[in-house]
């Protein structure tokens, strides 16, 4: 019985973290939420139950990203979990999103990666994308985090490297002076 109660408590804690993250991304407490009723997960959109098959691919990806960050904190105190060393790999975080959700996701990533990268100076993060706008947003985000890390830890700036995959080879990305319009042509 104690084990079952502990599992249910873990479910409530995880859902609390996921729902807090969903609220952060959607800028609303009711836009999208997950509830646990009668041993089942229920998706709520604007307070009304919705079938998983009826939500968009973007919403599914958002749930996956929120679950990813919540699962890292599983069975840990949130206050100390960020002080551990991590390697965070995030693959194309804003695919399938409209502009409003892209803004929410990038803001959420800045918030979460800030907690991890500033929580332990040895934590590393890799973001992969095929979208140049996401790349430029990520570059700005990492620039801000590098400055915050320099203030917090002092000394040399953290290393920030940019690469692109070209002809199956990973090469340094020539980011200076590169324009998205030129790339699209």
Q: Would you name each region that the model predicts?
A:
Residues 104-185:
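C-terminal lobe/lid and adjacent interdomain/linker elements of RecA-like ASCE P-loop ATPase modules
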Residues 88-93, 98:
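Walker B catalytic motif
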Residues 1-55, 70-87:
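Extended helical coiled-coil dimerization/tether regions that scaffold
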